[in-house]
């Protein structure tokens, strides 16, 4: 086992979860139970759970725009188009043409391929390229892109946050569901409903 509080340990924990499937109810997972956000889209809960198991400090939120905003506030963020990601970084996604024009998914970088692509472990995604990439119900290891690349992988990573390593004891209190910025505050239950509807093809207008 890798040393607690390290990127290696975070990756080890995440990889051990690959193959986990939600259920029996929709969006029901041990990750959501840990963050007290069960039965909601759980990619953020997965990252928080893995970080807690590994003793790594990440933003205390399951709302993906809020997590990105927190990393930016701490100066621990780098945009994808200029990034040099490292294993253990937290990747934030905005999938083109999925009906949600904002950061809407998060995962853990396990390897940088040094060609504009990375391998990530993500909760609540799909192993099938045709399945929902941000509400797919599985923990999967995925090949993702943050820059244009010769592999032809679609660019979906907006940027990366770098966690604080050092064997932290995280609490199991409910992470904030809101963003760190006033402009992005959304009730997590409402946002979860919006994301579910848009993933099924419904158009949500303001």
Task: Spell out what each predicted region is.
Residues 191-194, 198-201:
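Residue-level detector of alpha-helical secondary structure
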Residues 1-56, 155, 162-179, 205:
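N-terminal capping segments
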Residues 20, 71-82, 152-155, 202:
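Short glycine-aromatic motifs
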Residues 48, 68, 194:
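Short glycine-/small-residue-rich flexible loop motifs, especially phosphate/cofactor-binding loops
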Residues 182-185, 199-205:
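Cationic, hydrophobic amphipathic alpha-helical membrane-interacting segments
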Residues 8-11, 56-130:
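...with weaker cross-activation on analogous glycine-rich loops/strands in unrelated enzymes
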Residues 4, 101-186, 194-195:
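Aromatic- and glycine-rich peptidoglycan recognition patches
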